[in-house]
Amino acid sequence: MEYVTGVSKKETVEISEILSGDFEGKQVKVNGAVHTIRDMGEVAFVILRKREGLLQCVFEEGKTKFDLKELKEASTIEVEGTVRAEHRAPNGFEVRLDTIRVLSEPAEQLPFAISKWKLPTTLETNLDHRAIVLRNVRERAKFRIQEGVVRGFRDFLYSEGFTEIHTPKIGAKSAEGGANLFRLEYFHRPAVLQQSPQFYKQMMVGVFDRVFETAPVFRAEKHNTKRHLNEYTSLDFEMGYIDGFEDIMAMETGFLQYTMKLLERDYAKELKMLGVTLPNVEQIPAVRFDEAKQKVAEKYHRQIRNPYDLEPEEEALIGQYYKEECGADFVFVTHYPSKKRPFYAMDDPTDPTYTLSFDLLYHGLEITTGGQRIHDYQMLLDKIEKRGMTTEGMEQYLAVFKYGMPPHGGLGIGLERLTMKLVGEDNVRETTLFPRDLSRLEP
């Protein structure tokens, strides 16, 4: 009988091990994909692409046991050779090849050269060939940084006593309501794809006090803009026993501070590759919704057209205002009108036309919505009745409050929007692995 005893050490080495200098002058075995081949005659540079980056391998006619003409870009190979320090090589080390063994070959030539620094293709072409485009090191770097954001979110919240949860994405009713729902038949019963894990987050506050989730959400909005997707990844948390909605803003600020340090430490290569300057998150200004509108109207001579919500242009100008006034990259806009917030949002007791809620703007783009929730059962019922809503389909949710809930609140962060602003892109599809929008269901 054979037994599996865990992960065994491989014969092959990784780029990080080579760059440590410990293997200089030693024989190594490395595998990877052929990113590009630069044939100089008797010498050729075979650039291997691995998860950690690129590695320069040197093919020498008469010394390397392989016919270079047989090697194709995008082949996966295993090579053996000697590690040498070389200041002209990327990262200062290269492998002088003795042998090359082909593991697999492409059936066709790549549709375009992915080894170029910036691909000479349109966004639509990039999305049509998404899996190939993502092999480009610059494209790949965006999603390494996105990984860092999610790592930061998880690690920081774990350190603050949060429990990670996983909630259903198919339900009978959506927390946000409205008409922007993807509807489907669920074994002969009507169902919807969830716009938010809001109901479940609140339910679980009664169980774990502090919870978070990173998961997809679905919005059937017929927008065709650079900032909207119909499926995106939401970084959500909900926390109980708060003193006010300011606790939620403080927790998000802490997450951003932790994450920027993490990116600086563990993703310096990707940040440098993309020319990213990390934002200032030492302190984030907060301004009331109505005051923000007034400030922008006065400074930029703009008429207030919609008193109940922020238009995209207003968000951009608020970001510009606080960048000019105090060098801020982020700004919290607080106390949104009750009319524009969901029924579960806590109204401001000093003025119920406003809520104890907020959005976080990053360079003038909304990336977060959050606030304090109603935790009193009767208050929830009164708000539902006042809005002319029905409790049908919400019985399980309301039962949580019937049997006691602490003061609580939370937020949702759009991962793709946050990444877009971090890496300096202007279209959210650029920072989505496989975007879903009005026209795209593939790949």
Region locations from a protein language model:
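Extended, domain-scale alpha-helical bundle/helix-rich regions
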Residues: 240-248, 253, 293
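Extended, non-catalytic structural segments that build the interaction scaffolds
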Residues: 141-145, 276-281, 368
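Class II aminoacyl-tRNA synthetase-like tRNA-binding/catalytic domains
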Residues: 2-240
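Metal-assisted phosphate- and nucleotidyl-transfer catalytic regions
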Residues: 176, 254-360, 386-399, 403-404
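TRNA-recognition modules of translation machinery and tRNA-sensing kinases, especially anticodon-binding
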Residues: 206, 210-213, 229, 233-244, ...
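Short alpha-helix boundary/capping motifs
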Residues: 146-147, 312, 374
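Short, solvent-exposed positions on alpha-helices
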Residues: 91, 160-163, 246-250, 392
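Generic, well-ordered alpha-helical scaffold segments in large soluble proteins
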Residues: 148, 152-160, 196-206, 210, ...
